[in-house]
Amino acid sequence: MTRTRLLASTASAVPVRSVPTVGQLLAAPVAAVPAGTLVKVLGYHTAGDGGGMTVRWDPRATAPGNCGTVLDPGSAVGRWLQLHDGVGDFRRFGLFGTAEAADDALDAMVNDPAIRRIEAHTDLRFARRHTYFRSELELDFGGHTVVTKGIERNTHDNPFGAVLYFRGNRAETSATVTLAAPLAELSDVFEVPDSAAFGVGTWWAVESDVVPGGGRYERELQKLLQVTEIVDATHVRFNYQNGWAFAAGRKLTYTKVEPVTQVHVRNMVFIGADAGVKDPYVDGSGAPDEFEYTGSHPIAFEYAVRCDVSGIHATGTWWPVIMRRWCTHFRTTQCSLKNPPTVFYGGAGYLTQQIYCLYGHIADCLSSNARHLNDLTASAHCLVENCHGDGDDTGGNPFTTHGQYEHDLTFVGNSGLLDIANSGSLWGTSAKRITIRKHRMSWFVALTKITDLTLEDVHVTARSTFDPGGTFQVNADGLQLRGCTGVTLNIGRRSGRSSRPNLVSDCSFAAPPGTTIGQTPIDVPLTFRRCTFSGADGWVFNSSGPVHFEDCIVRGTAGAPITFKNSDVVITGGRWTDVGLQLTAVRDQRLHVGGGALFKGTNQAKALLSRQGGPGTVTWELNSYTSVASAGDTAHLLIDAGGNRFRCTGATFDGGRIAFAAAAFADSSYALHSRNVETAVTRDVPAGSDRLSVGDNLTF
């Protein structure tokens, strides 16, 4: 590594000479030039072209010339050394466009520790893929274009084969500890083999073993962490509060890392080597294997801390424009990607990917016709805001997480398709505490093992070019939806880690006929509060856990009733119009209706409240509600099968009929229908008995 001299701020007695160009400087004889002679070069190729510099003669220097910071006049000994204030400039290497590759100049400046900032003032071309271990450096391309046509071939499956790849050093040896005691969630004190090896301020790659019985890559912890305190001989504190609990006997592996730090890349327009080439994977002309070798992308970081990227605008890149793995504390802002060669090849066509990353902020980014705008894999405590992906109906979803135990991720003010933890069981399909606010899209899928999912002001709008159903799929494990809208709502249950209630409030949905809203595995309470449902026709709740509707508006099409298999169905307040509520009696069930609820209209079953002939006993608890039938043949209550324990008091019925079959109140069944108000109601009920009391009502 060659270290150039910084221009001294103190006055010098050495006279400063002047020459028009670098060529004239190098053509001048140097045999009699005194040591320390300063020369002001007015331009690189022509005076005033921006490539001018001040150089100093060092008669003892033997460093190889690099056409910029070290100028070789052709002598065995003696070099002109560029003086600078820590800022490097490609023009001072004679580069003013894309005619010549800028790779050698880039290497010279990055590998010079005296240079802390590198600037581009023209378009540039790079023909090689560069790997650096370098910190405290800023590269600013000034909004100019970088091209890479004909760049050297990449290696197989290598998203780190970027033009700029900054990588920290990872030790070759690791230390593993078997936990003697459980490691609780939110712990920042970790058990280690010997804390004497862990100095305060050192960085470590920390990995858990594979989840017992889990998938091949299923690990809850893979992060780059810094030691903040030595607690005792076998414990240290890290700068991270653990997102997942570990039982005693689980293993943690620690590998020391010397990260690259404070490297920032800014303001570049990047044209991928295969930009504009048709994707053979899509059109059937062949597999896209060749593209991973010939394609190009600008930036990759690995084992990096506080390395930021901003103002990168790429077209036609193969691997992610900004690729990160094992990164902690970073920002990616005001970047974009247009038209990558593929959206169907896994790992390709991304704007930014983060693997094993922590404390990241991705903001003000755009993607067009890409696979992903942002992918968070095995990452935590990251914020994605004001990012927008268009062209997402062609095969890519702008926002995704892998499902490799991500936790505490927040998305705010974004738009574009979004799915969570959806990459497959090999990685665990698990995530925790994902919060999404103010998001617009035409498809949302979060139906895997996602715990404590929070959605606020999220809107799924059906779009004929991608998902006409406007799908909204979520997991009932601490689920909280507030102020959301969608079309097809599907709620499942793939995990049961949370103690938080499942609540959908102030939301609106309009599912197609026959939609299964509550799936079979849901065995916990599910509450809908102040929600609006439109187009109800044959909807199904197959779940077994209780379901509550509080002050909800349900509008039907006078089609098939909504069927429920839930153990408890509780209706408090609200309005149900042209829709029937029918219990399947597949198990013992309880229906509670009250709180001023209103049922009104008719439906295909000609019954507003009814049951099927399943083997379960249905307990009916009806009070303080109103039922208005719009046709004389529509029943407010139709109970004609199975075992029933019926109680209705304080209700109001208008028009229609009430139909009870004697067989539905045999054996241990009973009915108490009393102190109600009935107006123009036709009764079809058996005579009263010691188990059937239908008197003491006010009838008109």
What are these regions (language model features)?
Residues 202, 207-231, 266-373, 379:
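Right-handed parallel beta-helix
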Residues 128-130, 148-152, 274-280, 317-323, ...:
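Short glycine/acidic-rich loop motifs that flank beta-strands on beta-rich extracellular proteins
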Residues 138-142, 263-265, 307-311, 329-335, ...:
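All-beta strand scaffolds that present successive hydrophobic residues in beta-strands
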Residues 37-42, 92, 105-129, 137-148, ...:
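Glycine-rich repeat segments that build the extracellular carbohydrate-interaction surface of secreted
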Residues 150-174, 238, 243-246, 266-296, ...:
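Acidic/polar low-complexity surface segments
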